[in-house]
Amino acid sequence: MLLIRIYRMLTDHFKNFFLYYLILTLALVSGIVIGPLLIKIFNLESKIRILRLANPYFSLALTSSYLENSVLRASIVQQIYLVLVICLMGFLNVGFYILPLVLLAKGITLGFTVGFLVSNMGLKGLVLSIGGIYPQNLFILAGLIGLGAVVMSTKEVVRKPLSRVFINYHKGRSNDAIVLGILYTIILLVGAILEGVLSPRILGLSLDYFIKL
């Protein structure tokens, strides 16, 4: 059964490379913690500029070019860009160390967005965050952590001494990495679709705050 095989790949990879999953998760959580702290540093105008960079919906909704279906397109493009960046790290020697920074940056943007909504809108901002930000990010963040761990584990295998046994081992690991990479990319795209559907409907309820500014 294909599903059983994929499940075994996932569990085996998680067990064998748990440290990478842990490192990336800690980097992400650190970013989520740092994000809200940045709100105290900037003035309101700067916060709104950062918000537009941090979230595809606000990037479009706070400009005159906003169209509802544009959020879905922008979110998908953003996730594809992240996938390409993460995969590119697999070809760079420093990529092994840059990947945690990618997750850190993603965590900062997420934490900043939620922190902005909560600090400026109170309970309403918290509710909007729960409904309009967290659902899709459960998929997006899981996909980023998984894909990052796959790339990091692939780089570790490449470092091992070459031998006939290693080559066969490497081929098997490469096949698994490709399958897992595709799976995590699909998870990311599911998150992007959710973002395109949920954000205009839920985060749209926050626009009255910006209109009053």
Region roles according to the model:
Residues 3-19, 62, 165-175:
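Cytosolic juxtamembrane amphipathic/interface segments immediately preceding
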Residues 12-46:
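N-terminal signal-anchor transmembrane alpha helix
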Residues 27-31, 35, 140, 187, ...:
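Alpha-helical transmembrane segments of multipass membrane proteins
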Residues 36-58, 206:
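Interfacial/capping segments of alpha-helical transmembrane domains
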Residues 37-40, 44, 90-116:
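Transmembrane alpha-helix/helix-exit interface in multi-pass inner-membrane proteins
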Residues 59-89:
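Interfacial helix-start motif at the membrane-water boundary
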Residues 102-135, 179-194:
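Hydrophobic alpha-helical transmembrane segments of integral membrane proteins
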Residues 146-213:
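Terminal transmembrane helical module of multi-pass membrane proteins
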